[in-house]
Amino acid sequence: MSAKVLNGTELAAKVKAGLKAKIDELKSKGINPGLAVIIVGDDPASRVYVNHKKNDCTEIGIKSFEYALPESTSEEELLDLIETLNNDASVNGILVQLPIPKHINEEKVIAAISPDKDADCFHPMNVGKLMIGKPEFLPCTPAGVVELLEENGIEISGKNCVVVGRSNIVGKPQAILLLAKNATVTICHSKTANIEEVCRSADVLVVAIGKSEFIKPEFVKPGAVVIDVGVSRGADGKLVGDVQFAEVAEIASAITKVTGGVGPMTRAMLMKNTYKAVLLQNGL
């Protein structure tokens, strides 16, 4: 393997250490940050993610409020809880763990969160501010990808960046953040013609489609940087990404692994957004 493996775990620890120092300073002034996490139903993957987030909060001194609601929770009950948290001064950030049950309107739930407590940066107002280049918060996974690139000395400005995937959570905001860093950005999706050729034009290739090992070596230009955001389970039940890691690592100059890559950075950016929310709400 010739590619450098970009270590998200190490960088996330560094980010969180910096945040802990800032949060300790806030606490010395009587300001105690709090993040509310709502999970509806008992999806095992969601439960793992929520536990990770709770541990991150504990690590850096943010109080974690967890609301584990049954699958049968009505939309009205969930919206009522969000309204209560919107009006709770001890809660600075609110996160609803997705996915939520199909009988609840996801868009309505996201829009119900107060924009200044929107730790995930999913609220339409925050997405709009992101689009015009004046964000209060940054979407967690895309921001984590950019920080991982920059902290490893990987140039973005003037580079051809290809994003595979057009979701509202990763693909679209990822393209916006790369564009803000002066990259030339192309988005690929299921209807893209000659997707292999387009991917091969990338200096930086970010893949977020949730298709197990979709990106093969022939999709990658020698020396390209490959960021694998996707996570799924292979036939053997093991976690795999959207990229054929071992094979692509022989061609790329830098690459992320499924574990210890983008995931820890996503959570570190959630902590950063929660800290920003505290500053925003306290006029700091």
UniProtKB/Swiss-Prot annotation:
Q: Which Pfam families match?
A: THF_DHG_CYH, THF_DHG_CYH_C
Mind telling me which CDD domains this protein's record contains?
Answer: NAD_bind_m-THF_DH_Cyclohyd
What keyword terms does UniProt attach to this protein? Amino-acid biosynthesis, Histidine biosynthesis, Hydrolase, Methionine biosynthesis, Multifunctional enzyme, NADP, One-carbon metabolism, Oxidoreductase, Purine biosynthesis
Single GO cellular component term: cytosol
Catalytic activity, EC: 1.5.1.5, 3.5.4.9
Give the catalytic activity.
(6R)-5,10-methylene-5,6,7,8-tetrahydrofolate + NADP(+) = (6R)-5,10-methenyltetrahydrofolate + NADPH; (6R)-5,10-methenyltetrahydrofolate + H2O = (6R)-10-formyltetrahydrofolate + H(+)
A biological process (GO) annotation for this entry? purine nucleotide biosynthetic process
**HAMAP family the record matches:** THF_DHG_CYH
The protein's matches in NCBIfam families, at most eight in alphabetical order, are given as: PRK10792.1, PRK14186.1
**Recorded family membership:** Belongs to the tetrahydrofolate dehydrogenase/cyclohydrolase family.
**Protein name in the entry:** Bifunctional protein FolD
Annotated source species: Ruminiclostridium cellulolyticum (strain ATCC 35319 / DSM 5812 / JCM 6584 / H10) (Clostridium cellulolyticum)
